[in-house]
Structures are given as structure tokens and as C-alpha cells.
């Protein structure tokens, strides 16, 4: 059985409470309007994202897709919500189409195009036409359309200073280049004026040359130069899976290195590999969150940005949902986990004031600012013992080992305080604790101070674990 699927709840004794499953009881309430509920879930993210800078990268495949106008509508919504946007687009299929029309050779080495003079002409043509197509969609304002009444200024320019890639491993890449720097001052000025910045996959040198660039590298360099809050890649594939075939939703830098080093079956697509490499570098360069989202899924961009569980892969430089000490500001979230059980009589009712006094005993796991699990540690140092209480997990998050993580975290805290034994009181979850090394004991084995508070009517079972 999964560690977070606790079948019932531990009882509270005296002034302290113990293990509960916050989904153990469902209390009747007035039906919730689904539209109102959606707005309530959506609103905190609106406030969190307003005024932030997001760099969004997508390939030329997205632009060529008949569904691209829908993605543009979603991007326009982000702008309307006060998010500062930089769009970086690719143009590979558009370039290849023009090369084919001209009968020119298409040559790639290590995923990079060899850009000779004929290829550069196709790059310029395709990049310019693709940029104009995106600008036209962002300018759409027809009545009875999602863009009705919307006016979005679009800024393009020579924001990217580039250099030639040169000769690598004996291969002359011609007019293929690399980003030298981003004119972040000019770019910031356009964003400050309320414009959406649109950057094609080309760069310019101080000598007036034009270079063909990889869109992922342009996006990465732009995000780093601006100190963006998010770097978002809209990729072609359906995402990543672990060895058991489960979707991967979060990656750390080390995880990405392992993925890139492994020989995937089937092999990883070029755009996904490029996005992972760029995301890894951006993460290590201070970008707090990098997102990989399948652009083919309708609404995936909005779901990733405005729901707690998202719709893609999140890259961060530190683990998500790390247990931490609760703060006073976490009290409302802890109450939301415990109140249903208190109302149902599973736990002893506690006031907000009392929880505020005891909050220093609590450890929590949060997700996007929402407390999704909690536990408390009440030491009895004179007896070398401590009680673990209030181990509760949000009903939507019981399949991720969060109960085990909190238990291990609390055990570690107890050891650090010189505690040798940890005890719990329960009526219905004894097997869960037995599986994790707790042994049955009698109330007489409890610290004297706890024995004085023991409720014999509830007749909770006592379980003790030697640390």
C-alpha cells in the first residue's frame, strides 16, 4: 500500500494530536459553482505572475501547425494578465522548405545546420516571413474572437549579438553562429513599454554579418540576460517518462545530465534534447524555473502556469516539496488540512490561536504555496522521547511518498535533539506504523506528562520506535 494512503486516522490526545488522513472524512457542503471554483484556483497564480518576465521558446513546427492561432491566443492572455513576454521562435521547417524549393543541399552536423551562402538566404527569408506571421496573429482583433479588443504592441529588432561558430572538429559551419550577448538594455526598454518582444533565430555581428542561430540557445541567453522568472520551452514531443513508464514532472540538474548521457529508447528528439541542455544551463545560471511543455496539447501552457500540478516538466536547481519548518503564515494551510477531521470528530478541535502557539512544532510540505502535508514533533526531553502528531496529507497528493518523507524528516529532527524514541497514538493506522518500525506498547510506556493527558475513553493504541 502506498505510504500516503492511510486508511484511517490517529486520534488526538490531550493538547497534542497525531497521524491523520485529511481525506478520511468527506463532510456534506453546499455545491460549489465550477466556474467560481476555477477562478479561485486561478487567481493566486495571476497575482504571482503579474509583472514577471517569461521567455517562451517554440519551434517553426508550432508556427506551421493549423492550431497555432490557439497558442497565440493563450500567449495574448498571458500578456493581458500583466506578464512581460519574450517570444523566441524557430524556423527549421520553413528554412528547409525554401532550401528544397531552391534545390539547395541540407547539411546538419551534431544537430546544427551548415549554413553556406544559399542556406543563409533561405534562413533570412524564412525567419522574416515567420516573424511577420506571428506578428500578424498577435495583431488580430476581430470581433467574436479570443483576440477581440486586444491591442498588443510587438517589438522586434537586433537584440541578439552573435559570432560565427567557426570550425569545430574539422567542420566549417559557415554562417551558423552562437550568441555573443543580448542587448538586454534595449530589450528591457521594450518590455517596460508594454510590448511583447519577438526574437527570430538569427543574430547580428558588429561587422554587419547575419548568423543562423539555434532558437533554444537564443532563448536560454535571453532568459539569463534578463534574469527572467521563467524560461518555457514548447516542445514537439509528449514529454518524458521514467523507467516504469510514468510521466516525469520534475527534474534537477543531475537528473538532466543522466538523461542526456543515457541512450534512450526511442532516442530523444533533437528539440527536446536541445531544450534540456538549454534548460540545464539556464537553471545553473540562476533562472529559478524552466518548463518543458508539449505544445500539441491544447491549453497546456495555461495549465502549466495556472494550476498546482501543471502539464509539463519543471526544472529547478533544488528539490520541490522539501519538508521545512512551519511559519506563522502557514497556519491557514495547516488548518485546512486538519479542520475536516476536527469537524468529523476524528481530531480534537483546536483554535487558530492555539495552532499559532504550537506552530513551531510543525513541519510542512508545500506545493506552489499550498500546504499539502504536515506533521508535528512534540519532544519530552527529560524522558528521551517525542511524540509525532498531525501527520496529514492532502487528498490529492497521496501517491508520492510524502508521508514517508515527513516521517523520515521528523525522525531526523528528533535524533538531532537527542531523542532516542518516537511514539505515536492511533486507533486505525497501526499497520502503517508497524511497517515502518514502530512496535506496540502500553500507555504506561509513555512519558509521565503524556500519561496524564491520555484519554482512556478513546483507547488509542501506543506505538514506539527506537531511533
Q: What does each model-identified segment do?
A:
Residues 445-467:
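C-terminal "cap" of GNAT-fold acetyltransferases
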Residues 100-198:
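Ligand-binding beta-strand-loop-alpha-helix segment within the catalytic cores
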Residues 391-399, 428:
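A short, internal acetyl-CoA/4′-phosphopantetheine-binding micro-motif in the GNAT/acyltransferase core
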Residues 399-412:
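Conserved acetyl-CoA-binding loop-helix of GNAT-fold acetyltransferases
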Residues 412-427:
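Conserved GNAT acetyl-CoA-binding A-motif
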Residues 68, 116-146, 184-185, 191, ...:
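Polyanion-binding loop/helix "lid" in catalytic or ligand-binding cores
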Residues 318-348, 459-462, 466:
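Short amphipathic alpha-helix that is part of the acyltransferase structural core
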Residues 349-393:
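A conserved beta-strand-loop-helix scaffold within acyl/acetyltransferase catalytic domains
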Amino acid at each position: 500500500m502506498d505510504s500516503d494512503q492511510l486508511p484511517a486516522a490517529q486520534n488526538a490526545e490531550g493538547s497534542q494530536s497525531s497521524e491523520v488522513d485529511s481525506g478520511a472524512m468527506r463532510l456534506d457542503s453546499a455545491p460549489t459553482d465550477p466556474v467560481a471554483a476555477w477562478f479561485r484556483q486561478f487567481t493566486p497564480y495571476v497575482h504571482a505572475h503579474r509583472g514577471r518576465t517569461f521567455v517562451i521558446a517554440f519551434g517553426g513546427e508550432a508556427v506551421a501547425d493549423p492550431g497555432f492561432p490557439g497558442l497565440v491566443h493563450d500567449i495574448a492572455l498571458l500578456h493581458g494578465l500583466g506578464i512581460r513576454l519574450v517570444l523566441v521562435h524557430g524556423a527549421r521547417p520553413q528554412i528547409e522548405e525554401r532550401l528544397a524549393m531552391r534545390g539547395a543541399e541540407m547539411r546538419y552536423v551534431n544537430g546544427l545546420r551548415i549554413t553556406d551562402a544559399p542556406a543563409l538566404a533561405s534562413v533570412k527569408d524564412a525567419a522574416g516571413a515567420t516573424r511577420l506571421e506571428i506578428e500578424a496573429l498577435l495583431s488580430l482583433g476581430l470581433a467574436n474572437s479570443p483576440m477581440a479588443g486586444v491591442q498588443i504592441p510587438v517589438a522586434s529588432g537586433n537584440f541578439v549579438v552573435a559570432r560565427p561558430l567557426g570550425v569545430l572538429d574539422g567542420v566549417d559551419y559557415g554562417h551558423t553562429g552562437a550568441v555573443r550577448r543580448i542587448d538586454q538594455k534595449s530589450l528591457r526598454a521594450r518590455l517596460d513599454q508594454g510590448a511583447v518582444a519577438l526574437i527570430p533565430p538569427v543574430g547580428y555581428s558588429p561587422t554587419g554579418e547575419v548568423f543562423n542561430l539555434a532558437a533554444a540557445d537564443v532563448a536560454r541567453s535571453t532568459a539569463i540576460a534578463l534574469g527572467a522568472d521563467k524560461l518555457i520551452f514548447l516542445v514537439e514531443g509528449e514529454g518524458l517518462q521514467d523507467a516504469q513508464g510514468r510521466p516525469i514532472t520534475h527534474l534537477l540538474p543531475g537528473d538532466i545530465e543522466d538523461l542526456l548521457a543515457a541512450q534512450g529508447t526511442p532516442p530523444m528528439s533533437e528539440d527536446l534534447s536541445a531544450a534540456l541542455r538549454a534548460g540545464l544551463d539556464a537553471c545553473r545560471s540562476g533562472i529559478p524555473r524552466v518548463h518543458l511543455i508539449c505544445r500539441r496539447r491544447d491549453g497546456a501552457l495555461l495549465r502549466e502556469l495556472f494550476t498546482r500540478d501543471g502539464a509539463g516538466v519543471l526544472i529547478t536547481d533544488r528539490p520541490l516539496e522539501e519538508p521545512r519548518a512551519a511559519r506563522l503564515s502557514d497556519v491557514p494551510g495547516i488548518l485546512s488540512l486538519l479542520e475536516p477531521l476536527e469537524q468529523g470528530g476524528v481530531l480534537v478541535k483546536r483554535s487558530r490561536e492555539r495552532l499559532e502557539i504550537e506552530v513551531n512544532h510543525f513541519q510542512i510540505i508545500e506545493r506552489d504555496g499550498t500546504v499539502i502535508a504536515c506533521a508535528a514533533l512534540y519532544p519530552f526531553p527529560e524522558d528521551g522521547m517525542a511524540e509525532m502528531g498531525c501527520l496529514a496529507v492532502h487528498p490529492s497528493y497521496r501517491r508520492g511518498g510524502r508521508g514517508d518523507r515527513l516521517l523520515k524528516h521528523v525522525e531526523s529532527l528528533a535524533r538531532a535533539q537527542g531523542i532516542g524514541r518516537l511514539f505515536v497514538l492511533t486507533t486505525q493506522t497501526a499497520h502503517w506504523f508497524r511497517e515502518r518500525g514502530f512496535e506496540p506498547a502500553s500507555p504506561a510506556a509513555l512519558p509521565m506528562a503524556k500519561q496524564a493527558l491520555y484519554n482512556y475513553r478513546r483507547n488509542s493504541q501506543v506505538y514506539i520506535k527506537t531511533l
